[in-house]
Regions:
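Divalent metal-dependent catalytic cores for phosphoryl transfer on phosphate-bearing substrates
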Residues: 7-10, 36-161
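Generic structural signal for well-ordered, non-membrane alpha-helical segments
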Residues: 16-20, 90, 94, 169-172
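Generic N-terminal amphipathic, Lys/Arg-enriched alpha-helix
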Residues: 1-13
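Charged phosphate-binding loop/patch that engages nucleotide di/tri-phosphates or the phosphate backbone
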Residues: 168-211
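Alpha-helical phosphate/pyrophosphate-handling elements in metalloenzyme active cores
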Residues: 12-43, 107
Length: 211
């Protein structure tokens, strides 16, 4: 099945599909330049699937915050899709994503999804990252390069998260600086050279990935 067909099957909102395409574009570029080598295709596929169930946590009220979602065509339709997804998979985005992956027989990606979440909340340092999968590490980074408006610098995304949700604690904010520097050491490319313009050129290719 092609990625675009999977997105259609699970009725992924355009905004959510674009988010995953952006993360996958970042992930693909990072993986391509990973110094120790990695399975770039596996990394990219993981990024294309990592938020499949996220519609369950979107605030799709009639007075929706368009600064987060932009213009949504047929809002009533997407409210109905959200209710259907709630009924089938629940209201936890992480569990909904895993439920969809299991149903689609893509269970090989489930451990990476769970691992990425553990790394983030553990504020993983070198000892933990040395034992982690490259797939989860690159997803962790790529997801922190994308805002609703596009691919941005890592620091801009961290500040965006802090502004919107508040820093979880001071150690988290300090850790983000460390992790950004650690990631740069793992690749043979200037991470700041990965931009929205460069990532957008990959969208058509990414939608035709076979999973």
């Amino acid at each position: 099945m092609l990625v675009r067909d999977l997105y259609q099957k699970y009725q992924i909102m355009p905004q959510l599909a674009t988010h995953m395409l952006r993360v996958a574009g970042v992930g693909k570029m990072v993986a391509k330049h990973w110094k120790n080598g990695c399975d770039a295709r596996s990394v990219t596929k993981l990024c294309l699937l990592h938020d499949l169930g996220n519609i369950v946590k979107f605030d799709l009220q009639d007075n929706i915050d368009r600064s987060k979602f932009g213009q949504i065509e047929n809002l009533k339709y997407w409210q109905g899709i959200q209710r259907a997804v709630w009924e089938k998979y629940g209201k936890n985005a992480h569990e909904a994503t895993i439920g969809m992956l299991v149903e689609a027989r893509l269970t090989e990606f489930v451990p990476f999804i769970k691992e990425e979440e553990r790394l983030y909340f553990a504020e993983a340092r070198e000892e933990m990252l040395d034992k982690a999968s490259t797939e989860a590490i690159i997803l962790l980074y790529g997801d922190c390069r994308v805002t609703p408006s596009g691919v941005v610098s890592y620091r801009e995304r961290v500040n965006d998260l802090q502004d919107r949700y508040g820093a979880r604690n001071t150690t988290w904010y300090d850790w983000t600086f460390w992790f950004e520097e650690w990631m740069q050491k793992q690749v043979s490319i200037d991470l700041n050279s990965i931009t929205e313009d460069g990532v957008k050129t990959l969208f058509d290719e990414l939608l035709t990935y076979t999973i």
